[in-house]
């Protein structure tokens, strides 16, 4: 059976990512966004937070970023782009963890940011751990 060089390379990248995340978590308290960190660090008992938003909240946030980058997508294009990004995140998470991305049982806290300012949410969450 032949090995797949792309799959082999992806697996090596994932392994290195695991090593880096573990090393960071062992050195000090840290916040890691994504990268299957909840799963990779599960033996270290991390506080796992899943931040999500409804589609209209995601679109609004993207529109705000879009203005500063001078990009423009139609609502339909933007919605499809967001769905594609979420689909790839779910596939990545599922592939490496055998768990469902966004499933509340995998997290200690789930935060809906649809009607919230992300910076305010981050500040509030930071205060939880001071």
What residue spans do the PLM features occupy?
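ATP-dependent small-molecule kinase phosphotransfer cores
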Residues: 1-29
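Short, amphipathic alpha-helical "lid/cap" segments that border enzyme active or binding sites
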Residues: 18, 118-126
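RNA pseudouridine synthases
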Residues: 24-27, 37-44, 49
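Divalent-cation
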Residues: 34
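Conserved nucleotide-binding/hydrolysis micro-motifs of P-loop NTPases
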Residues: 37-38, 53-58, 116-117
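Conserved phosphate-donor/acceptor-positioning beta-strand/loop module used by diverse small-molecule
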Residues: 43-64, 73-84
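Small-molecule kinase domains that catalyze NTP-dependent phosphoryl transfer to phosphate-bearing small molecules
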Residues: 71-118
């Amino acid at each position: 059976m032949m090995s797949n060089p792309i799959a082999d390379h992806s697996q090596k990248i994932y392994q290195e990512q695991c090593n880096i995340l573990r090393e960071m978590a062992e050195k000090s308290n840290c916040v890691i966004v994504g990268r299957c960190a909840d799963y990779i660090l599960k033996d270290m008992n991390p506080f796992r937070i899943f931040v999500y938003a409804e589609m209209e909240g995601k679109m609004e946030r993207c529109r705000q970023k879009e203005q500063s980058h001078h990009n423009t997508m139609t609502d339909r294009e933007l919605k499809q782009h967001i769905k594609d990004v979420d689909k790839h995140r779910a596939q990545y998470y599922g592939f490496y963890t055998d768990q469902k991305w966004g499933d509340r049982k995998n997290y200690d806290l789930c935060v809906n940011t649809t009607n919230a300012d992300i910076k305010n949410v981050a500040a509030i969450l930071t205060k939880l751990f001071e």
